Amino acid sequence: MKLEASCGTATSEVPKPEKKTARDAEPSSETRPQEVEAEPRSGSGPEAEAEPLDFVVATEREFEEVLAISGGIYGGLDYLPSRYHSWLRDPDRTVVLAKRNGGVIALESVNVIDAGETVLVEGLRVAPWERGKGVAGLLQRFCSQLVKRQHPGVKVARLTRDDQLGPRELKKYRLITKQGILLVRFNASALLAGLGARLAALRTSGTFSPLPTEAVSEAGGDVARLLLSPSVQRDVLPGGTIIQDWQPYRPSESNLRLLAAKGLEWRVDSRARPRVLTLCTRPFPIPHGGDGTWRYLNIDAFGSDGAQVQSQLLWHLQRQAPRLVGLNVMCQLFLEPQLWSQLADFCQVGLGLELVKGYTEQYLLEADI
């Protein structure tokens, strides 16, 4: 089903295709910064107006075309090849494509969360040959109007970005919170082979000794008790928000059900008096290297105790590495900005991981809709 749009004005409904009611067992989404054109440079762009765009609900048939417009995105860390099919099966999500002359030139996903009050904007990307023509602005405007019609209870739009915010973004969006981003890489087999000796050396030098950590069970209700606690929301969660692999959730019963379907692994310093909480998203393949040997591992850390973040990071690496033997891993750790240097040193000097790039930040933005 499609809509002709010569000026980016949505004038009729785009029905959502029937979807399976059961959620996919894999994590169904990953939020990322807006790709390339968060805003058109001027209005809708003269070239975008010259040739009408068709906005259509994405299907399995367009998968290869979506890959074709996504080459090189996020430096080989693109999640979409691993998420596209499960996105289409997500009953709370609509993936919209912009087409010109029958070919896919742009994509954006809108995902309704927070019990229907928030739309999460994800995955915006425009084909390299179409950038600078206002396509992104037209697609964003259409998706916003679509959400308003299909979900009248939605109050705000949220998105995450990792690029520097300019005056235009700060005027349009409220900054809810920010986290530091630490990106490292390693070979899982090599990490396992040398980890024992490295930890022994750290203990001997008095540099680091793992602190006790505790499991957090979703089935036993530990996750709900922690995340629905006012003190955890106030003192531990950044901006009172659970940010899971770039995707922000308000702490609520409905969102905890969404998170429970993703197979996350949680850790905390103390269930009785929590100060640091971490969660690890299941690793998935990424295009980096082009040989199928790379996986992406995402760990979100909440709290400001550096030694405890180190201990929980180590626990997650020890947990995941045996499952990734023979593979290379890009690991992104999100943490309090003031802890970045401490954790970067721990990862490089202590654990022998390779730092991929310097300090960057993840921004959580919000705007009324």
UniProtKB/Swiss-Prot annotation:
What EC number(s) does its UniProt record assign?
2.3.1.-
- Annotated region Disordered: the residues are 1-49
* The keyword Nucleus appears for this protein: no
Q: Answer yes or no on keyword Heme.
A: no
The protein's matches in InterPro entries, at most eight in alphabetical order, are given as: Acyl_CoA_acyltransferase (IPR016181), GNAT_dom (IPR000182), Hisat_C (IPR056483)
N-acetyltransferase domain location is 53-188
Q: What else is known?
A: NAT16 is the ortholog of the ectothermic vertebrates enzyme HISAT (AC I3J7Q8) responsible for the synthesis of N-acetyl-histidine (NAH). NAT16 protein, unlike fish HISAT, has only trace enzyme activity for NAH synthesis.
Q: What is this protein called?
A: Probable N-acetyltransferase 16
Instruction: Provide the gene name from the record.
Output: NAT16
